[in-house]
């Protein structure tokens, strides 16, 4: 079947719209501390994304997954989650200083396209 010019333009525009929306998903660009890093306890964890975040739909959980010399199930760590100095940053601030161990931040980021993207960042505190 041959497409007339209007049908072709409509299909082309729809394809471009879908492509543009797919590119609008936020991606984690960097984190502080960095994925897999080991160092002193951070006062805060910063996640930097490729897109502006919709803060009311974005969030994170901080979990201690291992502690030196002890076996235990992952333990939730009380922390506040807020926006950073720019709309592409999420800040996780632990309620108390982090002790030695392995930590994981499970994050959920939503940008203007409203599709949630999830991921995690793991780091160790000496």
From Swiss-Prot:
Effect on the protein of changing residue 25 to F: Decreases affinity for copper(II)
Pfam families: CopC
Observed effect of gene inactivation: Disruption of the gene reduces copper resistance to intermediate levels.
GO CC annotations on file: periplasmic space; plasma membrane
Induction: By copper.
Positions of Cu(2+) binding: 25, 115
Location relative to the cell: Periplasm
Activity regulation, per record: The redox state of copper bound to CopC may act as a switch between the possible trafficking pathways of the metal ion.
Single biological process term from Gene Ontology: copper ion transport
Keywords, in A-Z order: Copper, Metal-binding, Periplasm, Plasmid, Signal
Signal peptide location: 1-24
Binding site for Cu(+): 64, 67, 70, 72, 75
UniProt GO molecular function: copper ion binding
Entry keyword annotation includes Metal-binding: yes
Free-text note on domains in this protein's UniProt record: Contains two copper binding sites, separated by 30 angstroms, which can be occupied either one at a time or simultaneously. One is specific for Cu(I), while the other is specific for Cu(II). Oxidation of Cu(I) or reduction of Cu(II) causes migration of copper from one site to the other. The availability of an unoccupied site of higher affinity induces intermolecular transfer of either Cu(I) or Cu(II).
Subunit structure of this chain's protein: Monomer.
NCBIfam families documented for this protein: copper_CopC
Function: Copper-binding protein involved in copper resistance and homeostasis. Probably mediates copper resistance by sequestering the excess of copper in the periplasm. May act as a copper carrier in the oxidizing periplasmic space that exchanges either Cu(I) or Cu(II) with its putative partners CopA, CopB and CopD.
Similarity comment: family membership: Belongs to the CopC family.
Protein name: Copper resistance protein C
Native species: Pseudomonas syringae pv. tomato
